[in-house]
């Protein structure tokens, strides 16, 4: 409480009032969902609270009924397919991750969920009956009396006219007639209803395989200790025999139900061709010639970097002693002997600490088991259940809950049970020493080796090693090759030591895995663990394809943010831990991602919304058993309170002038015209918001006045906040996105004589743990400045209790990672987080999109990516400055004016209550008073019809998927019975067809080994249609595509259509948005109608694989799939020498394209060709990528 008062006094002294970030998100979402013209809210809330509560129960009941129907349809669909699926079940075996095992698991989960939903429905019905028993009874009596009294008038109704009878069904309840929007939002838009089982899984009390025969591995009870008499011996033998029989029966069930099949009849599946390009690796990149002058500049820069403070001698010495003790093999053997002594001590007290045994034979050391939290014990049990299925999984626990401890405990238990094989852990370079330290603490018997230059004690000053995982190359698909300082022979010796040891554990980085893939990818590992595994979220990135070639079926991903942006990223993660579980990427996008995305559009039809819901149900059942995610609030983690404030800072005079000058420049016009990359303009604006001197860094970095805090609004806020925090005894973490901003911050801290430490991509890996240890264990260091991509990943910085996030990131999970560095297990003080955002600028747009993406991520199966492809109006929205125009109205002021009327911004004028930010936005003497809003209770003002553009922008941020899908969902629930049955039936057919297409895609992918990357539409080999390789080849990372066995191709193309009709890349979001904008509801519904006819259409087109034109002309009523159409366009232009006139193209395709699809056709043509005008007229010329 004292800290809260101190914070409030600090903010008031700065002219700032704090805002609770969760309240901001809730208010923004609720404002975006509220109709501005609706003025009936206050009257409803006047005196009808019981009616509102009853309405909420009714809406909840309807949403539960909708989900019951959806889950029941999946069970019925599975049962209907069982008789026809007997023949395929005869082909069971090892290499096919599909069929009976997966179907049995999904059906069991669906049946359990259906039971829980029915219980919830009965409970809601009971609550409804209990809420108003007497009025309902009186209403029934009134209705009965009315029926008796109106006997005579009832005979007069038929002659009145049949028109009224016809019109009555038209008066169905619509959303506009439903004033209880909050009830609709709670009941329908909140996603799937959480059952009791799912709640227990979320709280860490159960595993996803609880009470599923053949999948659950329970803890076996310890055997009784008194066994002297013969009867006890007989019971012991009986128990041992029963245990063996039970294990044998369990293994038999696993062999039968495991999601794998063996194909005995290869003629029943499509054939695959060999890859179009031979398997080869890229050569060394060319080095640009460097002039002597530039070489001297490069030498000067590292000298400047060495000025940063190093860890204290005490901590450097302690860290070097720890590393040398772990590096030295002799000391390692001594450590093993010490652990043996510890084992002797444990055996002395074995009566108390015996091994805990799970079904199947996993023995968890007693000393280890007692140190784990309950949810961590459940995590170890879940990993063992996955091990018995020969499958992998994603540990998606929230940051700070001990994912590393759970993995090491499980690997140690495997070693203790004699089931361990040498394993590999891939992680960012910052976490290498932390992994080694945790491994030596939790299971000292592991012989840990680090495959990285930082572990080489002989090369003390190898600076290049620290650059390999810098934030500059973090998200790059084409990372620079880092020359290893160790000779290849030494790497070979290190790898051979790990592989030959029965307890070897290899730690390396993603970059080293990419460089040394030839050595590491040929080894059969026991386990492959990817820490911060969202690094492979891009399915076509080179590092992703390298990781998917690791030779093991036991794969684990550790990430605190398993779902960040879109469904294709979720596919990439799951395809690593369970190859082929979600099919190939083009089929997954067509059958799941596109329907779910289209169902979330504002103009989605009821059929599209229902289809999206059914597809989401199927996808959830596929994914959830292999994704374990627990939150801090659910597992009763003993953590202190965390509060988060958002401080909106004003631009200084210099910043505002620079910002406006850039917006008026020709460069912005080039961005609007599409002649320049928009990311360039976004980067310039964000630099201006941080500090305008960043634009002149190359020329003015040596100027003594470079980085003056008076020229940056956020720097002035930081200066005042740090001064107060220093006096109050707090310790601070400050995160920025770039090293350049850290340079300015470092100069500022040096001038203010603050004790600080710095860590970024240029910090040598050997110093990072020493820096972290020094900051956590001594109070001398006041502030630790870091970049979010290096210091915000997996590090433990509990020594701080104040965090400043200087600039927001487009990806909310990045800021979330940085925030969780201090608020985690081990923290003893309350944590306060400050986010600094420059008001009215692009940073405010980034922050609002963060809220939007976070809101959609919580719905798990929604795709927030649709706003990532910016159109013209989005660009104009980004490249604007809204600070003192339009009476000082900004997006933020609109939000906070609805939060509270009592907002103190340092200008106590009543006349300016409606212009909260006008005074602080205009230049004042100080120029940069930050402003924010306080969490309060004030009446909410609805935006009028003539609302500002900012209100409309806020609505457009949220009207895309989550909110309006709830509206359409409610319209479906209120539809009449006939229409509802038809919609549900059609949606069920689409969902079942999607599941069938996914099943066939898995069968196709199963031809290849688990170590062959899955086809993504651009890269990979497993499951790729042969026609794609024949026409386009592998357009990316051909060096990572393994050669498969050549096979016959007589029916390759037709069968590729049978697994989803996707040849080539899937429909992009930009094309999809253009299609929906051009054809409104018709185009989207036609696309889904085409999916309804996909199965029958593929049967017709398979017979004409050589000539797609004949089949398409005979089915004119059917819309051609965009992926097929773009391939036909490319083939036609190639046949005409790479160029064709508009007349010839139109003449050729006029009988295939419907009039309402002409806009899609034009966009597809622009995607692969450019229009060139010459003397002979205009011609379309293929782009180089398609020639």
UniProtKB/Swiss-Prot annotation:
Span(s) of short sequence motif DEGH box: 531-534
Helicase C-terminal domain segment(s): 716-876
GO molecular function terms listed in the Swiss-Prot or TrEMBL record: ATP binding; ATP-dependent chromatin remodeler activity; DNA binding; helicase activity; hydrolase activity
Primary residence: nucleus
Main function: Essential factor involved in transcription-coupled nucleotide excision repair (TCR) which allows RNA polymerase II-blocking lesions to be rapidly removed from the transcribed strand of active genes. Upon DNA-binding, it locally modifies DNA conformation by wrapping the DNA around itself, thereby modifying the interface between stalled RNA polymerase II and DNA. It is required for transcription-coupled repair complex formation.
CC per GO annotation: nucleus
GO biological process: transcription-coupled nucleotide-excision repair
Basic residues compositional bias, start-end: 300-319
Source species of the chain: Oryza sativa subsp. japonica
Region (Disordered): 31-53, 75-102, 217-242, 265-351, 457-480, 916-945, 1095-1116
EC code(s) of this entry: 3.6.4.-
Keyword DNA-binding: yes
Swiss-Prot/TrEMBL induction comment: Induced by gamma irradiation.
Family annotation (PANTHER family): DNA EXCISION REPAIR PROTEIN ERCC-6-RELATED, SNF2/RAD54 FAMILY MEMBER
Gene assigned in the entry: CSB
SUPFAM superfamilies named in the record: P-loop containing nucleoside triphosphate hydrolases
Feature: compositional bias, Acidic residues: 339-351, 468-480
Keywords: ATP-binding, DNA damage, DNA repair, DNA-binding, Helicase, Hydrolase, Nucleotide-binding, Nucleus, Transcription, Transcription regulation
Ranges of Basic and acidic residues composition bias in the record: 92-101, 217-230
Protein name per its UniProtKB record: DNA excision repair protein CSB
InterPro entries: Helicase_ATP-bd, Helicase_C-like, P-loop_NTPase, SNF2-like_sf, SNF2/RAD54-like_C, SNF2_N, SNF2_RAD54_helicase_repair
């Amino acid at each position: 409480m004292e800290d809260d008062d101190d914070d409030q006094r600090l903010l008031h002294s700065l002219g700032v009032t704090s805002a609770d970030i969760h309240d901001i998100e809730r208010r923004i979402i609720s404002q975006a969902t509220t109709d501005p013209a609706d003025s009936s809210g206050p009257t409803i809330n006047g005196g009808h609270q019981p009616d509102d509560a009853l309405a909420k129960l009714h809406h909840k009941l309807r949403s539960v009924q909708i989900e019951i129907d959806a889950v029941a349809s999946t069970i019925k669909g599975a049962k209907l397919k069982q008789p026809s699926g007997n023949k395929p079940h005869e082909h069971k075996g090892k290499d096919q991750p599909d069929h009976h095992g997966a179907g049995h698991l999904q059906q069991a989960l669906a049946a359990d969920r259906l039971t829980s939903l029915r219980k919830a429905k009965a409970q809601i019905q009971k609550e409804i009956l209990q809420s108003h028993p007497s009025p309902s009874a009186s209403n029934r009596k009134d209705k009965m009396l009315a029926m008796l009294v109106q006997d005579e008038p009832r005979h007069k109704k038929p002659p009145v006219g049949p028109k009224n009878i016809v019109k009555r069904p038209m008066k169905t309840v619509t959303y506009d007639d439903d004033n209880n929007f909050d009830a609709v939002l709670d009941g329908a838009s909140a996603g799937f209803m959480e059952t009791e089982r799912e709640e227990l899984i979320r709280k860490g009390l159960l595993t996803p395989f609880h009470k599923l025969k053949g999948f659950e591995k329970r803890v076996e009870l310890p055997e009784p200790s008194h066994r002297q008499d013969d009867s006890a011996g007989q019971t012991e033998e009986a128990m041992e025999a029963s245990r063996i029989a039970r294990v044998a029966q369990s293994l038999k069930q696993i062999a039968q139900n495991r999601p794998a099949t063996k194909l005995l009849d290869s003629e029943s599946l499509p054939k695959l061709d060999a890859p179009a390009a031979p398997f080869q690796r890229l050569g060394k990149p060319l080095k640009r010639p460097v002039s002597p002058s530039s070489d001297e500049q490069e030498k000067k820069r590292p000298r400047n970097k060495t000025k940063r403070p190093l860890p204290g001698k005490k901590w450097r010495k302690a860290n070097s002693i720890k590393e040398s003790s772990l590096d030295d093999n002799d000391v390692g053997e001594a450590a093993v002997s010490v652990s043996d002594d510890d084992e002797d001590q444990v055996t002395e007290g074995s009566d108390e600490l015996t091994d805990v045994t799970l079904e199947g034979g996993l023995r968890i050391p007693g000393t280890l088991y007692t140190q784990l939290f309950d949810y961590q014990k459940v995590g170890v049990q879940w990993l063992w259940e996955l091990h018995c299925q020969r499958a992998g999984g994603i540990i998606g626990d929230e940051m700070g809950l001990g994912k590393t401890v759970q993995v090491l405990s499980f690997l140690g238990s495997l070693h203790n049970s004699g089931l361990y094989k040498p394993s590999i852990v891939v992680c960012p370079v910052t976490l290498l020493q932390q992994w080694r330290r945790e491994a030596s603490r939790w299971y000292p018997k592991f012989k840990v080796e680090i495959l990285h230059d930082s572990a080489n004690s002989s090369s003390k000053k190898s600076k290049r090693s620290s650059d390999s995982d810098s934030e500059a190359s973090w998200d790059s698909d084409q990372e620079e090759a880092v020359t290893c300082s160790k000779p290849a022979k030494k790497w070979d010796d290190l790898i051979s030591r790990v592989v030959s040891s029965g307890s070897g554990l290899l730690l390396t980085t993603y970059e080293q895995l990419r460089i040394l893939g030839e050595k590491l990818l040929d080894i059969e590992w026991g386990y492959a663990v990817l820490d911060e595994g969202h690094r492979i979220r891009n399915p076509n990135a080179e590092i992703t394809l390298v990781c998917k070639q690791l030779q093991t079926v036991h794969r684990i991903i550790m990430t605190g943010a398993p779902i960040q942006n879109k469904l294709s990223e979720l596919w990439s993660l799951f395809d690593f831990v369970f190859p082929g579980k979600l099919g190939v990427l083009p089929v997954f996008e067509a059958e799941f991602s596109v329907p779910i995305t289209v169902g979330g559009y504002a103009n989605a039809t009821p059929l599209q919304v229902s289809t999206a819901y059914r597809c989401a149900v199927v996808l959830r059942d596929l994914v959830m058993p292999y994704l374990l995610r627990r939150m801090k609030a659910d597992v009763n983690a003993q953590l202190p309170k965390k509060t988060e404030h958002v401080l909106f800072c004003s631009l200084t005079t210099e910043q505002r002038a620079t910002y406006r000058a850039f917006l008026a420049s020709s460069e912005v016009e080039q961005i609007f015209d599409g002649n320049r990359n928009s990311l360039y303009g976004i980067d310039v604006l964000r630099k201006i918001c941080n500090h305008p001197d960043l634009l002149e860094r190359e020329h003015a970095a040596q100027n003594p006045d470079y980085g003056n805090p008076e020229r940056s609004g956020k720097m002035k806020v930081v200066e005042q906040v740090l001064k107060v925090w220093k006096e109050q005894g707090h310790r601070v973490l400050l995160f920025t996105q770039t090293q350049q901003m850290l340079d300015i911050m470092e100069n500022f801290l040096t001038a203010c004589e603050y004790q600080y430490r710095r860590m970024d991509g240029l910090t040598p890996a050997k110093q990072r743990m020493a820096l972290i240890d020094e900051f956590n264990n001594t109070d001398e260091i006041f502030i630790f400045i870091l970049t979010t991509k290096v210091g915000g990943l997996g590090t433990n910085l509990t020594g701080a209790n104040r965090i400043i996030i200087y600039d927001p990131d487009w990806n909310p999970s990045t800021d979330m990672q940085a925030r969780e560095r201090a608020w985690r297990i081990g923290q003893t003080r309350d944590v306060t987080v400050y986010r600094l955002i420059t008001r009215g600028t692009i940073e405010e747009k980034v922050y609002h999109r963060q809220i939007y993406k976070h809101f959609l991520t919580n719905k798990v199966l929604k795709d927030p990516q649709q706003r990532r492809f910016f159109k013209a109006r989005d660009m104009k929205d980004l490249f604007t400055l809204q600070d003192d125009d339009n009476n000082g109205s900004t997006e933020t002021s609109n939000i906070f004016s609805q939060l509270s009327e009592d907002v103190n911004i340092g200008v106590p004028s009543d006349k300016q209550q409606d212009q909260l930010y006008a005074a602080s936005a205009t230049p004042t003497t100080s120029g940069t008073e930050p402003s924010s809003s306080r969490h309060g209770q004030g009446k909410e003002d609805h935006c009028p019809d003539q609302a500002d553009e900012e209100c409309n922008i806020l609505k457009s941020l949220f009207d895309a998927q989550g909110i309006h899908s709830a509206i359409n969902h409610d319209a479906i629930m209120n539809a009449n019975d006939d229409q509802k049955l038809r919609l549900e039936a059609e949606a069920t057919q689409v969902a079942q067809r999607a599941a069938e297409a996914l099943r066939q895609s898995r069968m196709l992918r199963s031809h290849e080994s688990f170590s062959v990357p899955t086809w993504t539409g651009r890269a990979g080999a497993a499951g790729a249609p042969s026609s794609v390789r024949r026409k386009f080849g592998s357009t990316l990372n051909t060096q990572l595509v393994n050669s498969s066995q050549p096979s016959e191709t007589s029916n390759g193309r037709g069968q590729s259509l049978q697994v989803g009709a996707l040849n080539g890349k899937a429909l992009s979001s930009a094309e999809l948005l253009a299609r929906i904008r051009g054809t409104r509801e018709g185009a989207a519904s036609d696309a889904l109608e085409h999916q309804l006819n996909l199965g029958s259409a593929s049967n017709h087109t398979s017979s004409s694989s050589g000539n797609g034109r004949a089949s398409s002309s005979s089915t004119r009523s059917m819309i051609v799939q965009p992926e097929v159409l773009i391939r036909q366009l490319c083939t036609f232009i190639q046949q005409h020498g790479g160029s064709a006139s508009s007349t010839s193209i139109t003449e050729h395709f006029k009988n295939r394209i419907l009039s309402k699809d002409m806009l899609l056709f034009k966009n597809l043509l622009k995607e692969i060709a450019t229009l060139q005008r010459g003397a002979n007229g205009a011609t379309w010329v293929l782009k180089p990528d398609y020639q």
